[in-house]
């Protein structure tokens, strides 16, 4: 194993239990974000070879039904990009890349929010644990 991995492992083991949980939660969210963004970039490259305009992009990929109908962040972002684009001659790949950047911003903010929530949760767990130790320590 590499030195950097060994250092990361040691640092992780030195963390409090609640800090470990926070770290793992943030890692899961960021990994999910990377998968979503990577998937959209690949899809954008593939669709660009098939469709050249906003209308044909939506028709060829079924994005309007698949993502737009879900009411999710990705669907809403793609809908907004498609509606607000003035120059229909822009390539489908450019539209996808704009959508990907917007999704990255949203998920990045979500990661920060989870980090903040994790810190609050960590503090709350520490306070409860401290109270529990004080209560059980009295006889």
Curated annotation (Swiss-Prot):
The keyword Transferase does not apply. It is found in: Chlorosome. GO terms for molecular function: bacteriochlorophyll binding. Keywords: Bacteriochlorophyll, Chlorophyll, Chlorosome, Chromophore, Photosynthesis. InterPro entries: Chlorosome_envelope_CsmC. Its main location: other. GO terms for biological process: photosynthesis. Transmembrane segments: none annotated. GO terms for cellular component: chlorosome. This is Chlorosome protein C. The lineage of its organism: Bacteria, Pseudomonadati, Chlorobiota, Chlorobiia, Chlorobiales.
């Amino acid at each position: 194993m590499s030195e950097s991995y060994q250092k990361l492992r040691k640092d992780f083991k030195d963390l409090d239990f609640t800090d470990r949980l926070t770290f793992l939660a943030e890692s899961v969210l960021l990994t999910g974000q990377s998968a979503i963004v990577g998937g959209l970039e690949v899809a954008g490259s593939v669709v660009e070879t098939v469709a050249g305009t906003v209308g044909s992009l939506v028709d060829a990929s079924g994005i309007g039904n698949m993502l737009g109908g879900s009411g999710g962040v990705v669907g809403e972002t793609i809908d907004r990009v498609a509606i607000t684009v003035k120059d229909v001659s822009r390539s489908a790949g450019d539209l996808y890349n704009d959508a990907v950047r917007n999704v990255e911003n949203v998920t990045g903010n979500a990661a920060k929010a989870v980090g903040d929530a994790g810190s609050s949760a960590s503090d709350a767990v520490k306070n409860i644990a401290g109270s529990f130790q004080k209560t059980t320590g009295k006889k």
